[in-house]
Amino acid sequence: MEDPVQLKEEGNKYFQSNDYGNAIECYSKALKLITDKKMKAVLYRNRSACYLKQENYIQAAADASKAIDVDASDIKALFRRCQALEKLGKLDQAYKDVQRCATLEPKNRTFLEMLHRLGSNIQEKLHVQFSTDSRVQKMFEILLDENSDKEKREKAANNLIVLGREDAGAERIFQNNGVNLLMQLIETKDPELILSAVRTLSGMCTGHRARATAIVHLVGINKICSIMAVDHEEIALAACNLLQNIVDSLTGEDKKVHGKEEALVLDTKKDLKVITTHLLDMLVSKKVSGHGRDQALNLLNKNIPRYDLKNKDNSKTLFVVDVGLKKILKVLGQVPELPNCLPLTPNTRLNASVLINKLYDDLRCDPERDDFRKICEEYITGSFDPKDMEKNLHAIQTVSGILQGPFDLGNILLGMQGVMEMMVALTGSEKEVDQLVAVEALIHASTKLSRASFIITNGVSLLKDIYKKTKNEKIKIRALVGLCKLGSAGGTDYALRQFAEGSTDKLAKQCRKWLCNTSLDIQTRKWAVEGLAYLTLDADVKDEFVEDEQSLKAMFELCKTSDKTILYSVATTLVNCTNSYDVKEVIPEMVQLAKFSKQHVPEQHPKDKKDFVLKRVKKLLQADVISALSCMVKADNSILTDQTKEQIARVFLALCDEPKDRGIIVAQGGGKAMIPLALEGTDVGKTKASHGLAKIAAVSNPDIAFPGERVYEVVRPLVSLLNTERDGVQNFEALLALTNLSGKSDKLRQKIVKEKALPEIENYMFENHEQIRQAATECMCNLAVNKEVKERFTAEGNDRLKLIVLLCGEDEEVKLQRAAAGTLAILTAAEKKLCHKMTEVTSQWLEILQRLCLNEDLQVQHRGVVITYNLISAEKELAKKLVESEMLEILTVIGKQADVPNKQHIINVAREALVKCLDYGFIKTVS
């Protein structure tokens, strides 16, 4: 059994050596073993000191209190508790403790100074508190007085919002009956006052679980949802932020340390479930405005699906699927042109599609997905009614919405009996609303070639009729997009063109015409971009499109409008124009086999060859595509989906392909825009963006390409490209980029080391591929200046130094030899131990060093002579070995050379080495 006294002594030693963690462990073990009260008090006091050093003030105060319970005049424990309480903001209690200390030791200057300081702080706090209380009262008086002038009320409202965002101010408002007064402001029905009240409540809930819980029960979820339901965009958004802050505080997502407050709050799951239920009810209520419905969908999107799929708890999603999936489907099925439609905004149905998609992706197994599908099937089947056309429209609109979300599920639903037939039948209807819904559904349905073939066979003539005859622009543009999508059903395969030669060009021309027509509403022009997203799979169309600068600029301008739902279509169009989509590798033998077995072999369009793609990239850069992409990256996450990010990343990578173009990309902010794409999104998207960053970082000045602190964010994406699963080009360009960055500062070198890049770089130094091996060695050469890297070479039991020495002997690869010799020169200059180690790692070291010193490449020769000088300077015994070999003759020959400008630096180092040998007495001057 361990001795508690010995444990205490060990703890004291750990404390003196600043190892507070182990000290706490020793004191805690001793406390479990000891029964003597006085000894326990000493241990608690000592442990309190450790917690103070670790800035764990709650625990420090608790331990000091336990020591004081044993001995009320324990001056050390009193002072430690005083320090902890001061840090916790409990100045009045801290003052009492230091007052007691000063009574026990009246002449102690530390106690007297602290007593004076705490007294001043308490007075100041009381003054602020009383002035804050009076200010809060004054503000409410002004706001609730109908006779106050407008300017005064606005100022009071803004001050109240600012106070609510500060913890002290929020607490004063709360303690002064502020919640009830804020409710009175809401009841005035004045939009400005409602906005101020909601924003103040939002600030009060931020990062404070107890206050958030109190506000939930004082105001009520029902009331907050009714505020969010009003037809006022700013009020709906403010109420949404209030609910989000409440949810963050209740779940701990605010990332704040709550301390003792944790113990004051009961289980919050019930409150969170009530919030979710109210939000789902809002989706189908006719009393809720379009803005309110959008915010309810946004809150569900943000808080229900898991952020991290490693977390196995998807109970929130399962609850929403069971209780609210049919409600979400009802929103998806709304037809704005029908009289009984729920209030919507242009984004409501898209937000519902995004939510359906996220919920479906969040399901963990096939039974869960089957339940989801069955609910959808039951809902759609229940909506079909031969006697009620409005119900049929609702069913088709629901399928259309699902196709915009989880496409695989939508495709299964399309296979249900009568769904495709109903779509085609509605296309032939005389009612415009029927045509509108049917055409839009056909557009979303024709993504799969099998579905497109059915529509081409059964419905393409109807679409053409609608396009030619209808006078309704909304239907006309949708019919055009439907034809565009059907025309591109063969993808990039030149042999699978669906329409006659030239038909897709005509469709594209009409899309460009509508796109450039600024008199049309944004929604119609958005559909024109959608059409181009399909048609640009045809190389003739993309060539014509990039030549039309007016159309390009019109599309880029649309990206900058408030309606960001266009982003995916724009990104897809640019992916097609730059050919940055995935192309399967063509194996000649497989092509021959396919032809022999009479299988279809995809054909490449002549204009999809490399030189045509490069011309298109040039045109896009001239049209300021980088500014448009940078603007797209800044869009809200609910609109900028991971798939859109991936598309944008593909475009950036294609634009960075030519080294000559990278300067323009950097100048227009492309480097900065790629960083968020490399950190968030799909694995493919992050890899593409990281590769784009590598291309930029390899040839650009990091200070210009990634100004300020951004350069440190680039390191992680670059290191991710060193993974052995990435292809050789990605490995190579990442190494070049890291070489460039590591040459800038030691802080950057430290960041590269911290991101665990060294094992990967060392691995590539063994690579068979010459260029990758060279790039890895060059990177190591730049990193060798770093302290941690030197320590890795100094450590025993590894062959790192041996590898560097052997790479110095690669005479046929001059650049590799140069990098390896540079690394060795840096290491031997920094560590004398490595000079000695170098002579032990391989018996060939002397021969390799001599070859370096005689090398025809002046840079290699310079490095060889520097290494020799380092060895001579390090140790007399090493110098003796070198003098006894042919190295003395080599140094003498170099040192005796006449002064030549291009070789002077080498000659000078050789002479310094000879002087060192002279000092050792190994050689003598000839008089």
Curated annotation (Swiss-Prot):
Pfam families reported for this sequence: TPR_8, UNC45-central
Start and stop residues of the ARM repeats: 167-206, 209-248, 746-785
Keyword check for Repeat: yes
Species this protein is from: Xenopus laevis
One GO-annotated biological process of the protein: chaperone-mediated protein folding
Disulfide bonds, paired cysteine numbers: none
SMART domains xrefs: ARM, TPR
TPR repeat boundaries on the chain: 4-37, 41-74, 76-108
Primary gene name: unc45b
Function: Acts as a co-chaperone for HSP90 and is required for proper folding of the myosin motor domain. Plays a role in sarcomere formation during muscle cell assembly. Is necessary for normal early lens development.
GO molecular function annotation: Hsp90 protein binding
Protein name as it appears in the record: Protein unc-45 homolog B
Protein localization: Cytoplasm, Myofibril, Sarcomere, Z line; Cytoplasm, Myofibril, Sarcomere, A band; Cytoplasm, Perinuclear region; Cytoplasm, Cytosol
Domain of life: Eukaryota
GO cellular component: A band; cytoplasm; cytosol; perinuclear region of cytoplasm; Z disc
Secretion signal span: none
Keywords attached to this entry: Chaperone, Cytoplasm, Developmental protein, Differentiation, Myogenesis, Repeat, TPR repeat
Primary subcellular site in the record, as a coarse category: cytoplasm
Gene3D superfamilies per UniProt: Leucine-rich Repeat Variant, Tetratricopeptide repeat domain
